[in-house]
Amino acid sequence: MTAIKDDYYHVGLTDEQVRKSRDEHGVNLLTPPKRPSLWKLYLEKFEDPVVRVLLVAALFSLIISIVENEYAETIGIIVAILLATGIGFFFEYDAGKKFDLLNAVNEETLVKVIRNGHVQEIPRKDVVVGDIVVLETGEEVPADGELLEAISLQVNESNLTGEPVVTKTTVEADFDEEATYASNRILRGTTVVDGHGTMRVEAVGDATEIGKVARQSTEQNTEPTPLNIQLTKLANLIGKIGFSVAGLAFLIFFVKDVVLVYDFSSFHTFRDWLPALQATLQYFMMAVTLIVVAVPEGLPMSVTLSLALNMRRMLSTNNLVRKMHACETMGAITVICTDKTGTLTQNLMQVHEPNFYGLKNNGQLGNDDLSKLVMEGISANSTAFLEEEVTGEKPKGVGNPTEVALLLWLNSQECDYLALREKATVIDQLTFSTERKFMATLVQSSLIGKKVLYVKGAPEIVLGKCKDVMLDGKRVDAVEYRSTVEAQLLNYQNMAMRTLGFAFKIVDDAEASDCVSLVAENDLSFLGVVAISDPIRPDVPAAVAKCQSAGIGVKIVTGDTPGTATEIARQIGLWKPEDTEKNRITGAAFAELTDEEALDRVMDLKIMSRARPTDKQRLVQLLQQKGAVVAVTGDGTNDAPALNHAQVGLSMGTGTSVAKEASDITLLDDSFNSIGTAVMWGRSLYKNIQRFIVFQLTINFVALFIVLLGSLVGTTLPLTVTQMLWVNLIMDTFAALALASIPPSESVMKEKPRKSTDFIITKSMRYYILGMGTAFLVLLMGMLFWFNSEEGGMTTYRLTVFFTFFVMLQFWNLFNARVFGTSDSAFKGISKSYGMELIILAILGGQILIVQFGGAVFRTVPLDFMTWMTIVVSTSFVLWIGELVRLIRRLTQK
């Protein structure tokens, strides 16, 4: 916009120019990501591969139902589909509502602009391109633009570049060439921490840097989740087995009872063809029944329940899961890309070490004159202040984070900075600027009753204006002591700390009363150096070690300098003495690499410094190309594209709305430690799903071959449709609840991440399903032959015993499935597992009710007490054999 000349920025836009600008460049609102409609959200649940197999099974079942006029099985499958999809839909919708509440943004914040020659306040959303905006300390910048005036202006860019304090200027000679954005550019979403200025708006809404990042963050990640890949494989396998067995059975029966029985050459009328057609239809329906039996209706239910329960439990530990799949995907991650500020560190500047050379008691303030000078110097020579303390909470600061850190240190020394500031009469003040690199304040001191000049700033600059150094009650020549101070500064810089030097001068009444003249005399006394750091979160080193021991690589991606990033990596245990330059890179150097060159380096990288948002996004995509499952943590808008493209995006609860919108999980407590916990939940969840598959497929294996072999030997269908409904749906649902509610185990963190290409059914699972399934099949087929050979054949009583025996085998097998993959006893912790106890009672109670009162609907007759006891005790061998195997395993492991 060129309607305003720099010389006339104090006039601003006219109302007509505002209207034209808004028409041309739009309003200052970020377009919110398009939310899927409720019906689309629900239809997404049908993308589950197993649900799709269920839909095919429901269609075949419906064909049989129409022919036989028996709809129980069809209704059962449809109920299973509706339950599985409905639960997933409800939990994601519920999480979405919670997220919207968490992420409420207020676009009505008032902004000072110059229009029609007057300063006026307007809502942030009404700012247009060309507006002249007045910026004050503590205010958020409403749009992107060019600075027209900058007086000691410092900006917090941590949500865009990771830098908490960036100095801005309009003097080209003072531009920071290494800065991510030009020194005279100021961006929406950043905050003025010190000084003031005036800007001309050049971009609003989606055209701002934050808007561009937000738009990138809405680009959808097309990477399928590890669980989805496995369920697709499983659904394909089940489909192939079901259709193969059904096709083979149909072919055998069709040849045996149709092709070899009927002479087709003698058929002349439709009536002649009818018997053959009826037999063909009967065998076709049997084949379809086999397909229906083969499909594990309870699998989507189990997966959904497991994910839903995890969502709820993780919310109770301050982790808001927005996307249900993220619960499980966390268990498969192999790489975590994390930013530094606010994630690894506390994003709160603190005094690490006060080094006032003349103070005694290890830098503790006392009642001596030097302590008084330090206290008054920090209090009066500052523009920051602390907000009033809320009982039980630390006071919060407003202003330059470095100055706030100094005030917080005074506060911790039980010094009332505000009282000192109010008592000290300011005679003259020189605010901090990038040109001077120091701040000076001349006050009439209430503590010593004299005029005192206080100076603070870059230590090397302040020391250069001193003639002596206050050291243990003596004055030492500043030139002689300079090398000692420089060595100290170098040590602090290597520890990724900011440093400030402090000096003072007692001014006689006859001397000048302006700071510029007094400082120019170069006869100050140097008080010492204060090291200020953004400390790492206390739980981060242990959390990083936990992730590394679990086989997960951690990479720091930050806008900070290489030195600072490396020091933070060292402090958290990521950077080791043996690491070299191949383990770190700058964003600019990374951008220059071709994809082939970058692919060779990405797995070795531990640190990317001076990174821009696009660098982080590219890193994530290249890691995925290398087969990594990537989680990204971040709290700034700059993290949003990478958060969205990663398999799991983890935003911080105190992060920006754009970052949270792009993430899958929001860590409400901002704790990096929660990531390790989420990995543990995810891995345990995957094991629970595997346990359910073991239990479920054993049932399906047995049921499939019972129907097939039972038909081959010519017996009555051993299990009716309604009985199969109980076994396949009701028991599966109970089992899903029981196995999904198993709490996470710390032991999973000692394992390496599974490969996303590894099939969900492991070798041990295959052996268990085939071994246990074959044993059950031999037993049950033996029962069928025995009952058929007995006088009276297959009576309803014998079929009831057979049905109950079959159910009780699965009942005891549930105990084995609960501890599958471990050497623990099936009874370990069961007294605390109230869910499991209730489900055991529900299955037993349900079976008793069906047998005793099911009658014709379930084709059962009541059994006496002794028969019940015989079945329950005889089938329990399943559990005792499992217990013996696990006991032997425990003994051999010792």
Protein language model regions, located:
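Substrate-binding/catalytic subdomain of NAD(P)-dependent oxidoreductase enzymes
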Residues: 441, 714-728, 765-808, 815
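Conserved cytosolic headpiece of P-type ATPases
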Residues: 1-752, 758-761, 774, 803, ...
